[in-house]
From Swiss-Prot:
Subcellular location field: Cytoplasm
Gene: FES1
Protein name stated in the entry: Hsp70 nucleotide exchange factor FES1
Superkingdom per UniProt: Eukaryota
ARM repeat spans: 13-57, 76-115, 119-160, 163-204, 210-249
Organism: Candida glabrata (strain ATCC 2001 / BCRC 20586 / JCM 3761 / NBRC 0622 / NRRL Y-65 / CBS 138)
GO CC annotation, single: cytosol
InterPro entries: ARM-like, ARM-type_fold, Hsp70_NEF-Inhibitors, Nucleotide_exch_fac_Fes1
MF annotations from Gene Ontology: adenyl-nucleotide exchange factor activity
């Protein structure tokens, strides 16, 4: 250690004679001091997945491994390495596990991996059944709320600004998940918020026109969104206003029954207007106030 100290001081001072006299430090000592020589991120990802897929590992260790894996793939390069290392399939396999916590962890990893990451969004869509199982979990009233929330988190990040994902989602009947979640009397405010966020993400990847509006009507999406203006949760109301404002700014026109429903539900939130996004509130109010 003393030799390393002399070498460090000599280097800092630029004293060539002192550097030569001190000699080169032990590389192993440098590794110990500065953390070098440990496994790289891809190796750590493989090791974590090996624990997750090990039938003899207990649930606690699997969940710890999934937490570690998710921290690693917060890095964009590591997230893209999921495809290179062929790890999407084992991740998808955990979504069928009997343990709800493990399913939730898998969904969380998917959501984090594809967040603001076009390459990972595209890679995920290559896997047959991947999007389908996300939709099924989000829609299922048999799933625990925490698991469904994670499914909507994954859907939101997968759909956002990705045209192909939006088309596949709609083709698979994905729009059905929204009225199911928003009309569920047992749905928590957090679940509803995640569902509305996923709808917003879908709209960001879609061409908003009369054809889409007709689809939203037929699938019961539009009515369920408007009805949730009358909820008692400010955060849910704010998300609903954001979606409606998005539709309005895209030029869509509500029919008379929708405007009547909108006005009725809007009256319930008048006392909350100071706690809501002002621009969205006024944009929606203007639509029915001018009729």
């Amino acid at each position: 250690m003393e030799k390393l100290l002399h070498w460090s001081i000599a280097n800092a001072q630029g004293d060539k004679e002192a550097i030569e006299k001190a000699g080169a430090p032990d590389p192993k000592l440098l590794e110990q001091l500065f953390g070098g020589g440990g496994p790289d991120d891809p190796t750590l990802m493989k090791e974590a997945m090996a624990v997750i897929m090990n039938p003899e590992a207990d649930l606690e260790n699997k969940l710890i491994a999934y937490d570690n894996f998710e921290m690693l793939i917060e890095n964009l390069d590591n997230a893209n390495n999921i495809e290179n290392m062929k790890l999407w399939e084992p991740i998808l396999k955990t979504l069928e596990d009997n343990e709800a916590d493990l399913r939730a962890s898998g969904l969380s990893v998917i959501g984090t991996a594809v967040q603001n990451n076009t390459d990972s969004q595209t890679n995920f869509l290559k896997y047959e059944g991947g999007l389908k199982i996300l939709i099924a979990i989000a829609k299922s009233s048999e799933e625990p709320s925490d698991v469904r929330i994670k499914a909507f988190y994954a859907l939101s990040n997968l759909l956002r600004n990705h045209i192909e994902a939006g088309k596949k989602f709609q083709a698979l009947g994905g729009l059905d998940v929204f009225p199911v979640a928003l009309n569920d009397p047992k749905a928590t405010p957090k679940l509803k918020m995640r569902a509305i966020s996923a709808l917003s993400a879908f709209l960001s990847s879609s061409k908003i026109d009369e054809q889409l509006l007709d689809t939203l009507r037929k699938d019961g999406v539009l009515v369920s969104v408007i009805e949730n203006l009358g909820t008692d949760n400010v955060n849910v109301i704010d998300r609903v206003l954001s979606v409606l404002s998005h539709l309005i700014s895209s030029g869509i026109k509500f029919n008379d029954s929708e405007l009547e429903m909108l006005q009725k539900e809007f009256e319930k939130i008048d006392s909350l207007k100071d706690r809501l996004n002002e621009d969205d509130y006024l944009a929606v109010k203007y639509v029915f106030s001018k009729k």
